[in-house]
UniProtKB/Swiss-Prot annotation:
Source species, domain of life: Eukaryota
Classification via SUPFAM superfamilies: Concanavalin A-like lectins/glucanases
InterPro entries in UniProt: ConA-like_dom_sf (IPR013320), Lectin_legB_Mn/Ca_BS (IPR019825), Leguminous_Lectin_Domain_sf (IPR053761)
GO MF terms held by the record: carbohydrate binding; D-mannose binding
Assembly information from the UniProt record: Homotetramer.
Additional comment: Binds one manganese (or another transition metal) ion and one calcium ion. The metal ions are essential for the saccharide-binding and cell-agglutinating activities.
PTM text: The beta and gamma chains are produced by partial proteolytic processing of the lectin alpha chain by an asparaginyl endopeptidase. Mixture of 60% alpha lectin and 40% of its beta and gamma proteolytic fragments.
Its job: D-mannose/D-glucose-binding lectin.
Protein's name in the database: Lectin alpha chain
Keywords, alphabetical: Calcium, Lectin, Manganese, Mannose-binding
Family: Belongs to the leguminous lectin family.
Signal peptide range: none
Length: 49
């Protein structure tokens, strides 16, 4: 499979380039340039699995 997926944990809003104005996880399919954004909590206790 030649699918390339990038995942980014982003807490800085780059609104000038289309980033959401909230902490988020970006998931990008680099071959088709489709992006999805998902909110996340910045509370470390919420990150414990």
């Amino acid at each position: 499979a030649d699918t390339i997926v990038a995942v980014e944990l982003d807490s800085y809003p780059n609104t000038d380039i289309g980033d959401p104005n909230y902490p988020h996880i970006s998931i990008a399919d680099e071959n088709s340039l489709h992006f999805s954004f998902h909110k996340f909590s910045q509370n470390p206790k919420d990150l414990i699995l």
